[in-house]
Regions:
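Cap/insert and terminal regions of metallo-dependent hydrolase folds
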Residues: 2-16, 216, 222-227, 233-321
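Binuclear metal-dependent hydrolase catalytic cores
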Residues: 2-226, 315-321
């Protein structure tokens, strides 16, 4: 008993010393961590080739564990994002990718959850890199209005940051975004929207009515091909252009769980939420449908994203699938 009291007393003393010195301890930890944090560049760890990472795998429903749709594509020296949902830019930085190194963004469509991180992305790229021109944003017809709106909303901020930091950090020539529109390809056709250094980025029309235009993107580089579906119902077009590819990144929504949410909303008298839950399944693919598309096309790997609803309880992923 006496020995136990001695051990407990020593432990309490150590805890007290640690608490009193917490600022010093934190300073030393930061001194060790900051060089690694600020000096990390994930691109330097990748082999030459075509690479994918998710900086956001969720949809519009709020969740502490999921961000809006955001896909990183690395092709040789090129670094792209497909869509920029909320928190995507911050996750991109947490993954160790250089915000100042982003070459362009490709938008699949203009639903809020796919574009609401654009302003933050443009600001972070501008203020942390050495770019001298705005961030190019490729998208189907209508992208010009979206980009003009973001630039207008952030125009005061551009001035504030330039006045504070000057041209070294925030040159006005690089502030904001610039739209690069393209015509949505006809049904069943591909349109090349970017081609450089052995990389081809092709757009395809997808089925997300009443949302129009809506596209997916196919990236081909170094003998590898991946296709990002964007938001779409199950579609033969996806399967046709995904035939034999290495990776299909496909959105998915669980109609069973959405149905449970609709029934619950009805029981609570929440007609608005019930109507939303009734509406959304008809322009998304289910996990099973996405898997069927991948199987029938002979895809090497399938990666789900735009996971709806968010996975919030243990075991829910099994129900979602």
């Amino acid at each position: 008993m006496k020995r136990l009291l001695v051990v407990l007393s020593c432990g309490l003393i150590l805890l007290g010393v640690g608490y009193s010195q917490r600022a010093t301890i934190a300073e030393r930890l930061l001194a060790t961590a900051l060089p690694k944090q600020l000096g990390t560049n994930q691109l330097e760890t990748l082999e030459e080739g075509l690479h994918v990472a998710l900086c956001g795998a969720g949809g519009p429903m709020p969740s502490p564990r999921a961000s809006g749709p955001c896909v990183v594509v690395v092709a040789g020296d090129h670094l792209f994002l497909v869509d920029a949902g909320a928190n995507g830019p911050r996750n991109f930085a947490r993954l160790g990718y250089p915000l100042g190194g982003i070459d362009a963004v490709f938008l699949t469509h203009f639903h809020s959850d796919h574009i609401d991180g654009l302003g933050e992305l443009a600001t972070l790229r501008w203020a942390t890199g050495d770019d001298l021109t705005p961030l190019p944003v490729y998208g189907p017809e209508g992208v010009e209005g979206v980009i003009a709106g973001f630039n207008a909303a952030y125009s005061a901020d551009f001035g504030y940051r330039h006045d504070h930091h000057g041209d070294l950090v925030a040159p006005l020539s690089a502030a904001g975004l610039t739209a690069v529109p393209f015509a949505t390809p006809p049904d069943g056709e591909l349109a090349t929207v970017f081609s450089e250094g052995g990389l081809a980025v092709e757009a395809l029309r997808v089925d997300h009515a009443p949302v129009s235009p809506a596209v997916g993107y196919r990236f081909t580089y170094g003998g590898r091909t991946l296709l990002i579906s964007g938001d779409t119902a199950q579609s033969d077009k996806i399967g046709r252009f995904a035939e034999g590819i290495d990776l299909l990144v496909h959105e998915a929504l669980s109609p069973e769980i959405i149905g449970m949410m609709e029934d619950t909303a009805k029981s609570l008298g929440n007609e608005i939420m019930a109507k939303i839950m009734f509406d959304v399944p008809d322009y998304h693919a289910s996990p099973r449908e996405a898997a069927e598309t991948a199987r029938d096309a002979g895809v090497g790997h399938l990666l789900y994203y735009h996971v709806v609803p968010p996975i919030i309880v243990p075991g829910q992923e099994a129900l979602w699938l």
